[in-house]
Amino acid sequence: MIRQKIAVLGPGSWGTALSQVLNDNGHEVRIWGNIPEQLDEINEHHTNKRYFKDVVLDEKIKAYHDLEDALKDIDAVLFVVPTKVTRLVAKQVSQILDHKAVVMHASKGLEPGTHERLSVILEEEIPNHLRSDIVVVSGPSHAEETIVRDITLITAASKDLEAAKYVQKLFSNNYFRLYTNPDVIGVETAGALKNIIAVGAGALHGMGYGDNAKAAVITRGLAEITRLGVKLGADPLTYSGLSGVGDLIVTGTSIYSRNWRAGDALGRGEKLEDIERNMGMVIEGISTTKVAYELSRELNVYMPITCAIYQSIYEGKNIKEAITSMMSNEFRAENEWSK
């Protein structure tokens, strides 16, 4: 593939890891963010120690303070910013971008209030003449492993197969591989909702439960993710793929997962405000829990795990009581995933 100019919006852990992948593939990478000290550190020391203490980045990766400079003559732009600011950043991009580019995002969440997926936000805020169909980059991936070039397989989802194939070629190499998928709804809902289940799995660990309980939450969590996703128009097969069960396994079982760690701390009795302050990173599963709970009520979708996490976070119910109370729910058949 010919060398491409890529703006990566968001110098967090995943944005930094994906920047390295793109740089390894010979592309010009421009990272943009809003913390001057962090951007200066990337340019002067080639490190991002807030997320990776022992990683030295290639000096060809440049960080930009000015969004206009980062977007100049780009071939593609990758959004890796928190869900809550995606719309704001997209508005800024639409005011600056003066030519058509491939628009991608690698964030996982649903917008509070509107309940919208991130690709929908980008479609609303960036005019058609400035972008391709949105490409979603999602799947089972810890930034801590990708940054050290561990083997990682994820998904490029788009309604436009050619745009998805472009992104597939853009990122793929001998340690990082993408598969295309036309089911944008399925890929995005899987990526967002698995964070809730990861909080639940972490909470079980924090409360001292074993592998049996964690496996139950993960598999029944997949069932309720699928129920809501299908109601929203997703293909149920997507949830058995990389962006579905794959991402759920990686996020629901690992200490690298900030959502799992948040759940673990909740399970040990820590207060949410203390957890968020100590972690110093966005815990998408917290805000997504509220959105998913509201959607489940609106669409009449049975989501008991999401409901239990919601009750604990937003209604003050004891986390152990909220989760263990599910054991007395009405009996159901396992294959009632669609109800």
From Swiss-Prot:
**Active site per UniProt:** K194 (proton acceptor)
Q: Where does NADPH bind?
A: S13, W14, K108, A143, R258, V282, E284
Alphabetized Pfam families for the sequence? NAD_Gly3P_dh_C, NAD_Gly3P_dh_N
Recorded GO cellular component terms are:
cytosol
Top-rank lineage group of the source organism: Bacteria
Please give the catalytic activity noted in the UniProt record: sn-glycerol 3-phosphate + NAD(+) = dihydroxyacetone phosphate + NADH + H(+); sn-glycerol 3-phosphate + NADP(+) = dihydroxyacetone phosphate + NADPH + H(+)
Pathway, according to UniProt? Membrane lipid metabolism; glycerophospholipid metabolism
Q: Which SUPFAM superfamilies match?
A: 6-phosphogluconate dehydrogenase C-terminal domain-like, NAD(P)-binding Rossmann-fold domains
Enzyme Commission (EC) number: 1.1.1.94
Q: Where does sn-glycerol 3-phosphate bind?
A: K108, G139, S141, K194, D247, S257, R258, N259
Extract one GO molecular function annotation from the record. Answer: NAD binding
GO BP annotations of the record are: carbohydrate metabolic process; glycerol-3-phosphate biosynthetic process; glycerol-3-phosphate catabolic process; glycerophospholipid metabolic process; phospholipid biosynthetic process
Is NAD a UniProt keyword of this protein? Answer: yes
Q: Which UniProt keywords apply?
A: Cytoplasm, Lipid biosynthesis, Lipid metabolism, NAD, NADP, Nucleotide-binding, Oxidoreductase, Phospholipid biosynthesis, Phospholipid metabolism
Predominant location: cytoplasm
What PROSITE patterns would the database entry show? NAD_G3PDH (PS00957)
Where is this protein localized, as stated in its record?
Answer: Cytoplasm
Function, as annotated: Catalyzes the reduction of the glycolytic intermediate dihydroxyacetone phosphate (DHAP) to sn-glycerol 3-phosphate (G3P), the key precursor for phospholipid synthesis.
- According to its UniProt record, which protein family does this protein belong to? Belongs to the NAD-dependent glycerol-3-phosphate dehydrogenase family.
Protein name per UniProt: Glycerol-3-phosphate dehydrogenase [NAD(P)+]
